[in-house]
């Protein structure tokens, strides 16, 4: 009886610790449902129905492993990826890493900020510039939570992630996808033509985000409570839950686009405005409004995460610190310039995703090298099969992104 009570007490303590350590992966997972994903998934679903859902499944599994490795680096070494690169690489390499990471963080933020501004424009019927002003104000308010520590911010970002997931449950109810075809699309790989291959590469390229790899290792480096193994076990649960939610959202985006657009003959839907305006007559005003709200929530939360990632990159690589509000003000400027110049926001969004692809390998390669180093990682070092899978992901992602860049440059 006493043993049962002790086991029950230790079980409760383990669950309590696991809950206390939950949160960092929810911040990281937001990077996987940003407006870039909206645009890519909607285009893929409208063009090819359910046939590319399997790409989302595999991209999400790869992203899960990458985020576990990033989180594990922070737990094992109490340093984030940027700090490890600073400590182990020559100074010119470190400066190169810092500059490219800042450029990529700003390019990512451009897509996320404009995505939220488009969302405000669609649901409120205002101009894109007014939407951008609202986005700026909202992100400043969310970032103010950082003054109270990491936990309040984790709760707000986690809440926004759950809101987007709930919004897409509603969208699935409105669009009523075929469950048999949906399941088939998730399980059976299919690439009908060269455009499908290009879109599949785009889905994978938009899924793995370099700035979130840097950020996740910083969110776990100061975790306390329990042993390293217990923190790592709790982190795996954190990643599994958060990334499963993000994966569901991506699947639901593509499935909704397939059910609403592809099978009604609207296969040419390629931007967010079109998607919103077409949803209203096809499904209902409520469905279009829910889409707009989910775009705002995803854009706001991901642009906040992008600002935090930029701060981690600067502090980690060059030990330089600026207040978050200053960084937010600076990184908003490109978005306002794009809007004031009257450039096509969806085209800018796609171009920013292409620029982002340059940074994926630069973040993944050192992450794999460091997490495979026993002197750094101790008992949390990568197993042999994790190394093999990790390098296979690197080769695949790099090859697909090079192919995407070449295709984009040649206008394929």
Swiss-Prot record:
Keyword Lipoprotein carried by entry: no
Q: Which UniProt keywords apply?
A: Cell inner membrane, Cell membrane, Ion transport, Membrane, Symport, Transmembrane, Transmembrane helix, Transport
Give the residue spans that cross the bilayer: 19-39, 46-66, 94-114, 122-142, 156-176, 196-216, 241-261, 290-310, 329-349, 350-370, 389-409
A molecular function annotated in GO for this UniProt entry is:
metal ion binding
* Gene Ontology CC entries for this record: plasma membrane
Query: Belongs to which family?
Result: Belongs to the NRAMP family.
Q: Which PANTHER family does the record cross-reference, listed alphabetically?
A: NATURAL RESISTANCE-ASSOCIATED MACROPHAGE PROTEIN 2 (PTHR11706:SF33), SOLUTE CARRIER PROTEIN FAMILY 11 MEMBER (PTHR11706)
Kindly provide the name given to this protein in its UniProt entry: Divalent metal cation transporter MntH
Q: Identify the species of origin.
A: Citrobacter koseri (strain ATCC BAA-895 / CDC 4225-83 / SGSC4696)
Q: Which gene encodes it?
A: mntH
